[in-house]
Amino acid sequence: MKTLILLIQFFTRIPLPIQINMDEINLKKGSALLPFVGVIIGAWNWLIFTLVALVMPLPVAIIAGLFAEVIITGGFHVDALADTADGLFSSRKRERMLEIMKDSRVGANGVIAICFYFLFYGALFLSVTDTQQICWLFFVLPIVAKGVTMLLFAKMTYAGSKEGLGSIFLGVPWWPIVIAQVIVLAVLGLFFSYVGVIAYVGVILFTIIYRAFVYKRIGGMNGDTLGAGGQMGQLICLFCLVLLWGLV
């Protein structure tokens, strides 16, 4: 329970008035619980979307659901997406890319990445005609994001500073990663049947390509690229689901 509370405090802005000594918790092994943080985020997104959809048109409810995740996470991973875009697409050397990612200011690449991310995300949601499916998507996609983050932990080389937040998860063993993937696949299968499982195969392929690209550019992962990977992973999952629903 302490591990889950610490993960919630780490990945969300939920005000839990509980002090936990990190030295007492093995976050590497406890990271298997990370998908349950996605469950909490997803439940919040689902609640906000459902409530707004009762009184407002569907596009407004979708925007509210997307904004709900920004609220509960503090825009933590959206900021990581912007920093990653600024750094990786700066056409600079590795050291300079890492410096750019640390910069609190958002550059042109970051703004473009965020704009296209939410435009594409919103368009995909609007292409889903079943409102109940949209409800489930708001719940499930944050769980997928945490599954992608767990995949990126596998044999991770850390490119950031030793004080970086992502360094906490350096050396995560295989078994928490496998458990997290089983949880994600079970959730996708439960809500979206075999289509959900196939969609996650697409997510895994994306994760492999994304990981290879990041390693080629900066030699490993850091907190920003980990967070960005999760955000893009849930976008890719939604894309694959919409594509498969159009084919079957």
From Swiss-Prot:
Pathway: Cofactor biosynthesis; adenosylcobalamin biosynthesis; adenosylcobalamin from cob(II)yrinate a,c-diamide: step 7/7. Keywords: Cell membrane, Cobalamin biosynthesis, Magnesium, Membrane, Transferase, Transmembrane, Transmembrane helix. GO terms for biological process: cobalamin biosynthetic process. The keyword rRNA-binding does not apply. Pfam families: CobS. One of its GO terms (molecular function) is cobalamin 5'-phosphate synthase activity. It comes from the Bacteria. Its cofactor is Mg(2+). It catalyses: alpha-ribazole + adenosylcob(III)inamide-GDP = adenosylcob(III)alamin + GMP + H(+); alpha-ribazole 5'-phosphate + adenosylcob(III)inamide-GDP = adenosylcob(III)alamin 5'-phosphate + GMP + H(+). The keyword Transmembrane applies. The chain crosses the membrane at residues 24-44, 70-90, 106-126, 134-154, 168-188, 189-209, 228-248. One of its GO terms (cellular component) is plasma membrane. It is a multi-pass membrane protein. It is found in: Cell membrane. Its EC number is 2.7.8.26. Disulfide bonds: none annotated. Coiled coil: none annotated. Belongs to the CobS family. Joins adenosylcobinamide-GDP and alpha-ribazole to generate adenosylcobalamin (Ado-cobalamin). Also synthesizes adenosylcobalamin 5'-phosphate from adenosylcobinamide-GDP and alpha-ribazole 5'-phosphate. This is Adenosylcobinamide-GDP ribazoletransferase. The gene is cobS.
